[in-house]
Amino acid sequence: KLHGKVHTNGFTKTDECCPRLLKAPFVCNGCPKRNHSNCPYPRRIYHAKTAQQEYESVLVESREGIPLTKEEFYKTEAIISSAVKSGQNIYHAIKANDLSVSKTTVYRHIECGYYTISKIDLPRAAKFKPRKGQKGEYVPKGVKIGRSFEDFMLYLEENPSINYVEMDTVIGRIGGKVIMTFQFVNVDFMFGLLLDNKTAAEAAEKIRELKERLCAFGVKFGDVFPVLLTDNGGEFSDVFAFENGLDEEPETKLFFCDPNAPYQKPHVENNHTLFRGIVGTGTSFDDWSQENVNLLFSHINAVKRKQFNGKSAYDMFTFAYSKEIADALGISFVAPKDVIQTSKLLKLFS
């Protein structure tokens, strides 16, 4: 009712209000006579987009500035500043003087420089370090057009026989090296690439090195990785680094899961349990090399799997692809009696 806009056209014959507008919904949007010439009244139309913009504008304006009159603010400021300089804490000053302001608001006003006192006058606040406000990088929405999980499912329907690979990133120490993992869904085979940092540029560089390594074996990246499915981590945002070959021609399809939906790539998530059985959460990868990562995943892929009737993921991969491609990915054969599935494996790292 508040956001209805009055419109007139060539059919309007009077300035009077239509009787139908005196009751709900108070607008002409659903009226069958809205576009008919036999309605002589001005039209009152509700525009949802305009109403939403007005609502958001009011919402922002209502939260701007200080919710006190000029006199109230200066009175509060004088009392608080005087009390703090006398050695009282802020909460005590507020309650002792029955001020209609919260402790959080006072701290925020001090932080903004509205008071004559500063953080240096607050013994405890001066000791506190500012909170880290670092925000993780994510894949821009525009990049995901045509690459959403819905698009992925449609692509699988059109190409039911195609094999796809799930990708993820395993975090070690926050801010340190990470491992970008690849899970071949059809054979439960996993390998990883060690990244110096969790950025799109670093991921793109490692992918290019992998493509060059496969090319040296006479294999195109797109032949082994026709379809990739990953999450919304910022390290995957350079989509063309994954999709295009060394000749810059498209050879791979990259798709993204919906935000906060790890269950859409369950195979790589489940296989990470084998990884975490060896490497505990929070373990730093900073001293690791790519050879260490290769050794780790070689042991993981050597584990016998029930779903393969006692065969290992390595056995299945070399049968479906080849030993040469496994070598190119850095994964080697480990005899069953030598397989280690605990943290003891880390002692073999050089």
Question: Which residues fall in each region the model found?
Answer:
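Secondary-structure boundary/capping micro-motif
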Residues: K1-S284, W288-S289, L295-H299, V303-R305, ...
